[in-house]
Amino acid sequence: MAEEEMRKHLVLAKPFSLEDEKDSEHTASNVIRKILSLFKTVRPGSDLTNFQLPPQLNLPRSQLQCYGEMVYSFVGQDLLGECSRRDLPIERLKSVVTWNISTLRPVVFGMSPYNSVLGETHHVSNGHINVIAEQVVHHPPVSALHATHEQENIDVTWCQYFTPKFRGTHVDVEVKGKRVMKLLNHIETYEMDQPRLIMRFLPAPGAYWAGKVKIKCPETDLEAELHLISDSFIERFRGNNNRSIKGKIFESSSGNQLYNIFGHWDRTVMAKNIKTGELEVIYNAKENITGLKPPTVKNLEEVTESESTMVWSEVSEGILKKDWERAREAKIVVEEKQRASLKQREASGESWVPKHFLVVKDGKDWDCSPLQPTVPPAPLVIT
């Protein structure tokens, strides 16, 4: 399909919001049989990185879009900007914790985004926040993201990749790489870990975030630890409900604890001052990730051929219209184009060079640095 014709079919799907979980199409009973049938021939411990799903089990967006939505898709308060607006270091760390929690989004059980193709990009703006993401490596699937806040002089970079493993009763997705936020007005750097994703089939189907997240700022000697509680039977028996979060803020050097963090990331999260006993709500999910809107096209001519919403537009349109044969055929076209590009590069001896990031492999780890200091305004915007 010619590029100009593809532009006419640009599909911008709505991000998954809290209220969408009540949609009957997303209930576990509607997908569990299809999923189990897919894994009949898959052995426990198998790497599922390149496992291909039928369109019926795909969300109408790529993995790269999902990463971007964690940063640019929100309603209400600009939580990223708040990280730099606070006067005291402890208040800034609390704001970074709040923003980090806000990047956690509901996961649709049994449904998965498309595997982003090499060179795919996603460029969206929301107010003063500009985000560019790029698929910089295909095997393993390494994604890089750069976001800048024009007004508050904030720089966010992600370099991450995931390794899904089939464990018999569940799929365990370990998200590797790092996230770094720089508050340039305060000369502070915050390094963050990432939680794991669990897709459980038995005994009760469900999808949830789990594991430990650390947030550390060397310049202020402050650190936070967040524990996302797994939705296992044992944890529920202990009284830890689905999507609960517990943690603490403390001084790195002394270990002196300053705050307790507790609550549910899909509802409210509280912070308790250890010294004064004062309680405050630091995050309200309903105010931030309810009623999310898709981007709109501000400048069609600036939408590039590598833009996620263009690469997958035919597939997404087929899924949204439940035209599964059309979606399947369109998905094959995208995959064949990817293979043809690889074959052409191998024949000519060319190496793939990302457009927006410098990528370095260090042993088994990857590091991605943006080539430009700031992200320009995007042709796709949140209004």
Curated annotation (Swiss-Prot):
Superkingdom in the source lineage: Eukaryota
Per UniProt, what is one GO molecular function of this protein?
Answer: lipid binding
GO terms classed as biological process: lipid transport
InterPro entries per UniProt? OSBP_sf, Oxysterol-bd
* Tissue specificity as recorded in UniProt: Expressed in stems and flowers.
**The keyword Magnesium is assigned to this record:** no
Keyword Transport among UniProt keywords: yes
Q: Sorted alphabetically, which keywords does the UniProt record give?
A: Lipid transport, Lipid-binding, Transport
Tell me, in a sentence or two, what this protein's role is: May be involved in the transport of sterols.
User: What protein family is recorded?
Assistant: Belongs to the OSBP family.
Protein name stated in the entry: Oxysterol-binding protein-related protein 4B
Q: Which organism is it from?
A: Arabidopsis thaliana
